[in-house]
Amino acid sequence: MPCGKPGDYKYGEHTADVLIQAYGCTLEEAFKNAALALADLTYYSSRVEPKESREVAVEYEDLEGLLFRWIDELLYLFDAEKFALSRRIEVKLEKGNGYAIRALLYGEKYDINKHGFTGLIVKAMTYHMMEIKKVEDYWLVQYVVDI
């Protein structure tokens, strides 16, 4: 179902950091687009084929902590395994005593010749300027990463 979201995500300027605003008609879609925005900072996720998969499960007591752990886990997969995300990501968000994300990520080993390099390397996730909120009929997920 279409909604009035302004796009999938956009970047904002921030010295030595990058502000990311990801959008979704659902919170799950916003978290998925937050992951794609992270990937597209370093390489072109549209060039990544969904050859391999990784299961990711993260939990936290609030949505901000959940977002931090989600992005941090994706950074780990790229740094430790050179796992490049394709645009195929299945995200399920659960709410109980806290929040949990169960995701199935598809991608392949990063290859600079195939996936490209934007010139930016994300070093770390931060809590700076983090915001998660519903705006009219869509969700906004905002966060800052160190580059």
UniProtKB/Swiss-Prot annotation:
Coiled coil: none annotated. InterPro entries: Archease, Archease_arc, Archease_dom, Archease_dom_sf. GO terms for biological process: tRNA splicing, via endonucleolytic cleavage and ligation. The keyword Calcium applies. The keyword tRNA processing applies. GO terms for molecular function: calcium ion binding. Keywords: Calcium, Metal-binding, tRNA processing. It holds the Pfam family Archease. Ca(2+) binds at residues 17, 146-147. HAMAP family: Archease_arch. Belongs to the archease family. PANTHER family: ARCHEASE, PROTEIN ARCHEASE. Activates the tRNA-splicing ligase complex by facilitating the enzymatic turnover of catalytic subunit RtcB. Acts by promoting the guanylylation of RtcB, a key intermediate step in tRNA ligation. Can also alter the NTP specificity of RtcB such that ATP, dGTP or ITP is used efficiently. This is Protein archease. It comes from Pyrobaculum aerophilum (strain ATCC 51768 / DSM 7523 / JCM 9630 / CIP 104966 / NBRC 100827 / IM2). The lineage of its organism: Archaea, Thermoproteota, Thermoprotei, Thermoproteales, Thermoproteaceae.
